[in-house]
Regions:
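Active-site metal-binding loops of divalent metal-dependent hydrolases
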Residues: 10, 135, 165, 264
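Conserved phosphate/ATP/ADP-binding segment of small-molecule kinases
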Residues: 157, 169-244
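Anion (oxyanion) recognition and catalysis
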Residues: 44, 70, 148, 152-156, ...
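Glycine-rich phosphate/adenosyl-contacting loop at the front of the ribokinase-like
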Residues: 1-74, 300, 320-323
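Conserved phosphate-binding/catalytic region of the ribokinase-like
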Residues: 1-5, 152, 208-323
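Short beta-strand/loop segments at the ligand-binding rim of alpha/beta enzyme cores
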Residues: 158-165
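Conserved N-terminal subdomain of the carbohydrate kinase-like
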Residues: 49-134, 311-323
Length: 323
């Protein structure tokens, strides 16, 4: 079985070859997309095994995704196929400010119809880390219940649960519902990994240390806060209860497209945990993967191999950071 497991909605990504508008595009090269899919690709590229849990439609998009996963070695044994619901896809066009324009075609998708019984036949043998996000949780009440059940089952098997909230407010009936649901999942997690603004939203607090205390007091073991392009900070409690923190700056790069940076960061955290890196080197690797990813227009094609990551860390200058 794989070392890592994730659950989410993989999509086909059609990228316009123009820089500002779909109308100017002459071709739409297809690649892969979806936050959890990006993480799976990142973990795979760094030399670790990962299994994907989802539902795909019996259509060309589903065939493409399954073929891609099988081709690079992502375990697909926990993927269902279904008739009557499409596999999601998206259209993306680059923007000069690094924030691309994206149109989603995912309403009523097969993934959104995933139900908790998909967990029944999952074998957790060998799985060390479960990665979940707030995106798949937000699709429907069933997907939220599926994620919750998967987390609960994983914990029964002593699997470390890493939760990236990755909020999508438009998928929730209200902000209050999103905050409540997110914090319930955070309380079940071992590693909670929000961006600073996300942590502020979900905790109602402003300062990173206060946000960390809020989640450490819930029982979260590690709180990792992403500080945008500046870097990141990790908080945890020592055996005596004292809060410990590690702050690591990011790298100097030219930004092409910011999509996938957080997913790349997550893949770096996951592989670092698998390899037993200390907190400083964990954040260094995670920052590096995120920095490399923003230099590529694709959501995942820029994600590095372990060798590429090592060279980037060795030769790329750092920024300065302070809390």
């Amino acid at each position: 079985m794989s070392e890592v497991m994730t659950i989410g909605e993989p999509m086909v990504n059609l990228i316009a070859d123009s820089s500002e508008t779909y109308l100017e595009a002459r071709t739409l090269p297809r690649q892969m997309a979806g936050a959890e899919f990006n993480v799976a690709i990142g973990v795979n590229r760094q030399g670790h095994s990962i299994s994907y849990v989802t539902t795909l439609g019996n259509d060309w998009q589903g065939d493409l995704i399954l073929d891609y996963m099988n081709g690079i070695g992502i375990d697909t044994s926990n993927i269902r196929r279904m008739d009557g619901a499409p596999t999601g896809y998206q259209l993306k066009v680059r923007s000069s400010d690094g924030e691309p324009k994206v149109i989603y075609f995912r309403t009523g998708s097969a993934a959104s119809q995933t139900t908790p019984d998909i967990v029944d036949n999952i074998d957790f043998t060998g799985v060390q880390i479960l990665h979940v996000t707030g995106i798949f949780s937000a699709l429907t009440p069933n997907t939220y219940d599926t994620v919750t059940r998967l987390v609960q089952e994983a914990k029964k098997h002593d699997v470390t649960v890493l939760f990236d909230p990755n909020p999508r407010p438009t998928l929730w009936p209200s902000q209050e519902a999103m905050i409540d649901a997110t914090n319930k999942l955070a309380a079940l997690s071992d590693v909670f990994m929000p961006g600073l603004e996300e942590g502020q939203l979900f905790s109602g607090l402003r300062e990173p240390r206060d946000i960390a205390n809020y989640y450490l007091n819930m029982g979260v073991k590690k709180v990792i806060i992403k500080l945008g392009d500046a870097g990141s900070v990790l908080f945890e409690r020592a055996e005596n209860g004292e809060r410990m923190e590690t702050v690591v700056p990011s790298f100097m790069v030219s930004v092409v497209d910011t999509v996938g940076a957080g997913d790349g960061f997550a893949s770096g955290v996951i592989t670092s945990l698998l390899e037993g890196l200390d907190n400083e080197h964990l954040l260094e690797r995670a920052n590096a993967v995120g920095a490399i990813q923003v230099t590529s227009v694709s959501d995942s094609e820029g994600l590095p191999t372990a060798e590429e990551l090592e060279k980037f860390i060795a030769f790329t200058p750092r920024k300065e950071i302070s809390l």
